[in-house]
Structure formats: structure tokens, C-alpha cells
Amino acid sequence: MILLGIGSSFVFLTLLKMKGEAIRLSPLFNSAVMLRNAGELIAATSICLALAYVPISTIGAIIQTVPLMITAVAALFLGERVGIRRALAIGVGFLGALFFVQPGDANFDTMTGLVFVSAIGMTIRDVGTKLVSDSFSTLLLSFYSCVLFASSGVILLLFTGGVSSPDANITVLFLAMVALGSLAVIFMTEAVRLGDMSVVSPFRYTRLLFSLVAGVIILDERVNAMMLFGSALTIGAGLYIWRRELTLNA
């Protein structure tokens, strides 16, 4: 995490220099940026710790609750009107997540709770990103995100201990992660800031597809019928909310 955060920070630092944009500290004291950064720190720390203990397919399924959480937060704190249909859909979506993780099962890992904490952090981050003023550039916000990601690695290092040196194969993967991660941060931040949340949200569900494929094919994880049913409930609820929002805003 530390190396990835530092590497990505240098990428954005270079892009900022190329655009002639100064690194300002004043945005760090903006309330919306502070909210976004707090969510980023919570999400990054908890998700990376969860990756060491929780199957990636489970992580992908739980993260799909983020659009549901955003809708709930918009209703509770941002004054958005959410009718009974969307409220019920939110409940169904969370029920689907419970079906997937199966908390009563003998194989349930309590570390799964870290993924829910990360989902809450992502929700806080996305809401904060939406509230950030247009006067703050996406590159600058992305630079802050990478610095926070490296800081999260330092925090985890204090608790876990131990530092390992990467070999040649890991170094290649690390460089690929820096490149792809930097692009992902830019595109994600830009989409959330400029796009309509109801349009952006459905694309989040592709993460579950990728995590399931990676978990089953690459990591040899097992997915049962109950987990697939839970995934269908969560995705179906999210897509219903998205469709309902489009209908109401038409």
C-alpha cells in the first residue's frame, strides 16, 4: 500500500506539474474535501486489511451495497426524497448482501465486517466528492487520495508489522497497479463529480462480475447457490433504484 500510494502520488504530481497546477493545501481544510478524505482513509485501510482474510468474491459482493448506502445517505442527510419503493429496494439489497456472506454459516469469518466498514468509507468518500467545489481539480483530489492511500499503509504497518522486499515479478505487478490504479482514480473521481449519480451507479455492479470471475478462476474460490442468489438480490435492488430515479427525474 505504501509503495503503491507513493508511486501513484508521483504520477499525479507529474501530471499536476505538466499542467502548471500548484499543489495547494487550502482545499484540505474544505469541509467537503475533509469528508471525502476521511472516507478515503477509512475505505483504503479497511479494504486492504480485508483482502488478507476475506475472499475477493465476498468483497466484491459487499461493495455492491455502496450505491444503496449512497441513496440512503441522500435521503437522510442531503434532503433527497426517497419513496417507499426505493426504501424497500434498499432493504432488499442489504438482505442480498447477508445472503451472500451467510453470517450464520460455520465458515463465516468475522473479518468480513471490515468490508462493510470499507463500504461505509466509500459511501462517505463518494458523497464528499459530489459536494466538492468545481474550483478544486480532479488531479489535485486524486493526488490527495494517493497520499492518503500511502498513509493507510503506514497505519496498517503499525498494527501488522513486517516489511518485505518485492522480487522482479512483484515489481512488474506493482508498476501495472500504479498505472491502472492512477487511471482508475482519475476516471472514478471525474465520473462522480461530473456525472449524475443515477447514471454512474449501475457501472459499479461490474465489479461483482470481475471479482467473481477472478475469485473462481484465478484464486479457486467456491461460490454456492445462496451466494449467487444474494448477489442477484443486491444487483437487482440497485438497478431498480437506478431505474426508478431515472423515471422520477424524467
Regions found by a protein language model. Give the residues of each.
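Helix-helix packing/entry segments at the starts of transmembrane helices
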Residues: 3, 60-65, 132-148, 185-216
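Cytoplasmic-side transmembrane-helix entry/capping segments in multi-pass membrane proteins
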Residues: 27-37, 82-94, 111-116, 135-148, ...
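Hydrophobic transmembrane alpha-helices of multi-pass small-molecule transport proteins
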Residues: 85-102, 226-245
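Membrane-interface interhelical linkers
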Residues: 6-35, 84, 136, 147-175, ...
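Glycine-/small-residue-enriched transmembrane alpha-helix faces in small-molecule transporters
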Residues: 106-131, 250
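Hydrophobic/small/kink-forming positions within alpha-helical transmembrane segments
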Residues: 13, 37-45, 67-72, 97, ...
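Membrane-interface helix termini and inter-helical loops of multi-pass transporters
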Residues: 95-107, 157-174, 216, 220-225
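C-terminal transmembrane-helix exit sites in multi-pass transporters
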Residues: 47-49, 66-88, 209-228
